[in-house]
Amino acid sequence: MRGVWPPPVSALLSALGMSTYKRATLDEEDLVDSLSEGDAYPNGLQVNFHSPRSGQRCWAARTQVEKRLVVLVVLLAAGLVACLAALGIQYQTRSPSVCLSEACVSVTSSILSSMDPTVDPCHDFFSYACGGWIKANPVPDGHSRWGTFSNLWEHNQAIIKHLLENSTASVSEAERKAQVYYRACMNETRIEELRAKPLMELIERLGGWNITGPWAKDNFQDTLQVVTAHYRTSPFFSVYVSADSKNSNSNVIQVDQSGLGLPSRDYYLNKTENEKVLTGYLNYMVQLGKLLGGGDEEAIRPQMQQILDFETALANITIPQEKRRDEELIYHKVTAAELQTLAPAINWLPFLNTIFYPVEINESEPIVVYDKEYLEQISTLINTTDRCLLNNYMIWNLVRKTSSFLDQRFQDADEKFMEVMYGTKKTCLPRWKFCVSDTENNLGFALGPMFVKATFAEDSKSIATEIILEIKKAFEESLSTLKWMDEETRKSAKEKADAIYNMIGYPNFIMDPKELDKVFNDYTAVPDLYFENAMRFFNFSWRVTADQLRKAPNRDQWSMTPPMVNAYYSPTKNEIVFPAGILQAPFYTRSSPKALNFGGIGVVVGHELTHAFDDQGREYDKDGNLRPWWKNSSVEAFKRQTECMVEQYSNYSVNGEPVNGRHTLGENIADNGGLKAAYRAYQNWVKKNGAEHSLPTLGLTNNQLFFLGFAQVWCSVRTPESSHEGLITDPHSPSRFRVIGSLSNSKEFSEHFRCPPGSPMNPPHKCEVW
């Protein structure tokens, strides 16, 4: 791997998790639930981790039946391991082709406990692979979904907690700032003393909020500038700095649609289906207004209804995500002067000069906008809306974002709405989980060195690099056999695959205390003032964003912190990134059979690699520039191939609600391509190294084990409400169909499991892109 060296300040945009350049991720970015996948709780901040007072009540709150069941499960698991160990002793001399090491016995136990062998694998492979896991893992309290990603994140959280609570003299100043931030979050006594005062004072400084008191400042432009730059809210539209898609060597101001409090426009527009959520959202708004001193509910509710109606008007002009997938069509570069003509409701030059100060912006400043029609319509909406309502809406954006940093009453309001929105049940999660999550989201690179030193073996980078090379080789082998692609485009595609840059574990700069301290030099965390620390961070992170404008993008910037259980592909950098957090079981274990590692981390690598060639990634060349580098004949052939997948996944449904095959197309292409590349890489490994020993008692070949390992990565459960939210917001298909969809397209899977032609897992017509 090439050296990772981001200059301290330019690295900070990604180090803070604040970069907004496009990326394609392995899984949903939220590992737990948030009120919104965007503006409401940015940086992935999750509200549902907050404990009422203490996590110690969790066991006590269990019924006697629940306690007995927990004990029984533990005893059964111990018995299973003991039986497998006994089998290992009994057959050790009989079957040299069977792996009987402690690691093999342990992983076999885990696989068996997750399976449901009563299900026909040719009928429903997801239930066959995950049926046991699903029965043993109901959605935990405080969550609306649970799976292997969540489980691994919990493990990482526990490590981070220990590191934050046990300071050492050798930590850097940046690491100490993360510890101060965490401890302020944990100081519930001080938070309860302050109650709503910090936010109420902030609202007063902004000129008031008609919902809680006199509104004395009729200055729309000033308020918009302050809430955008100092508190990183995005009412009406979002403004950020990122690599120019058509000139990836330079950063540019970018403007896009934004401003909804709920996760998707669908919640506002499909009122009958989402009546419960809309009612719950309004009640939540009213409750926060009361907690902030609004007094009489009869006076608050009509004004909050007006805000909700305004958000509904925003939803009406917001473009659905599935119609924004062709980036060549939605990309428009204009000057600041042209933007003023396009959306005259905003005084753009004063706005941009204020939020990007001290950088000077003039009328010729290039700006990329992703939907001209939206900006025209939002400008009209602003000009035709009462100024008091506009101010109420902007302050509501601020309240949504910051109320979770206040006392327990606000947490209770959050949790009540979470139950309506996501089906999240009562919470008995300890406070530290909320604080670890928030600290990691905001200061994840500051605490990154602690996590890396505690968890990441240095040779893991070289091991992961080798896996990536094997997957890339397999992908290029498949690329050479495609019949629908012309030779010229194929050659360019291979050059792009060769040029993909690998980032593994962590960026090297975080391990240099001096460089890390430079990154966070301008951020100060103060003891015992949690709300203040969060507000300082928002202001600090925007200053870092503004600082990027006149600097070139840095290939070595990261958009995920080391503990994250995820991975991503960046099209403007043509790079794939695998944080240390995902380089663990069940994705990778050095003592596990290669079949499982290729089915785990191998498919993850293949997934991200294939994103370079999905319906959006394929539009970018090897240098990360958005341009038409395919011949027209191959473009048309690609579209025909992908339509098969759109139709296939659109026929899947959850609780009677269909999957959006077009919105999920990119992820489905990556899932299918990643599985194919990983399987081929495993076959190449076997040819080179010989067949490995099989696991005991499973009765499965290693090729079957590869597919089983892949499927068990996606074992998960969700509440009906969370499933609905995922279907309308998430670009990934539901876990069940990530397994069934990919495997039913794999002829190798059907061959190894001997699935009869026409069976559900071996349909007569299979979709294949890569």
UniProtKB/Swiss-Prot annotation:
Positions of modified residues (Phosphothreonine): 25
Higher taxonomy: Eukaryota, Metazoa, Chordata, Craniata, Vertebrata
Cofactor(s) the protein requires to work: Zn(2+)
Activity regulation, free text: Inhibited by phosphoramidon. Activated by K49-P1-20, a twenty-residue synthetic peptide shortened from the snake B.asper myotoxin II.
Role played: Converts big endothelin-1 to endothelin-1.
Compartments, record wording: Cell membrane
Entry protein name: Endothelin-converting enzyme 1
Gene Ontology biological process terms from the UniProt entry: axonogenesis involved in innervation; bradykinin catabolic process; calcitonin catabolic process; ear development; embryonic digit morphogenesis; embryonic heart tube development; endothelin maturation; G protein-coupled receptor signaling pathway
Originating organism: Homo sapiens
Main location: membrane
